[in-house]
């Protein structure tokens, strides 16, 4: 199967899946099983299609180009986060919620011609033909589960997985802390607070991605860049342990989300410019999905055990979270140093 066709075919499958769910929902009156299947699929799709997108980006751009451009590219996610809810609000009233799946399918088909255009630019404008054999001349084959073997047998990929696992752990800690503190507020008040935080996150993420991320990587290097948000979160959780106030948790949540969109996520995706095509398209989705969902599950159990099992309060849980953030920082520094070494043997090796 040609690498050139892999990403367009994946987007075609994504688009087709929404059409299938729409048709099934129209045919069958009893939709309980269909709705459950759709929920499971969306939970996987929400991570998988983003993973495929970033695999494609790390295929197009060199290490140096990714350092300059990935922050700007990531702004698209923040802009989409602003536009998406507006589209849903407009068309859900006039078309109904079911037909929104057709709109989602159409929006997934639009990038396909853009993908072919960008593939042509790789050698014509970006001058990246030296990164790999031209995409059209390579095939992907072998065991479709090879990504799991690549992940668990390669220390670099394992470290990326641990980094994602710790990120999801911190995310869950901050979210649960915030949720507990907001429990005393009414539902309208909570809605206003969440909306204000979302607005702050989008503004901060877009401005940072456009004007700062590339400069941060270029000036301070990858170790400092990828460890920047973890360090800030670690310090913030220590402050929260001393002063368990709602304002502190809100700031932590805003910094964590905006920092992930604008700095941590782009920096993390730059790490995959060092690996070969096979690893990029087989192991990366495994890392993104398994580590992310696994981190969610483990952290939920841990938080429940600490609060309900051991009866720990906000301050104690924040202190434990600070320790996790400290470990997250160390893993980030390790990955950043590996990235800057740019081991050519790793790039061309079989994983």
Task: Show which residues each predicted segment covers.
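Substrate-agnostic recognition of the 12-TM MFS/MFS-like secondary transporter fold
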Residues: 34-93, 136-150, 155, 163-213, ...
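Residue-level recognition of pore/gate-forming positions within transmembrane alpha-helices
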Residues: 11-18, 105-109, 168, 202, ...
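A membrane-interface helix-boundary motif in multi-pass transporters
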Residues: 2-8, 87-109, 189, 193-196, ...
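C-terminal ends and interior cores of transmembrane alpha-helices
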Residues: 12-31, 116, 213, 231-245
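C-terminal transmembrane helical hairpin of 12-TM major facilitator-type secondary transporters
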Residues: 223-263
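Hydrophobic core positions of alpha-helical segments in small-molecule transporters
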Residues: 9, 72, 102-103, 162-163, ...
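Intracellular loop-helix junctions on the cytosolic face of multi-pass helical membrane proteins
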Residues: 2-5, 23-26, 31-36, 63-67, ...
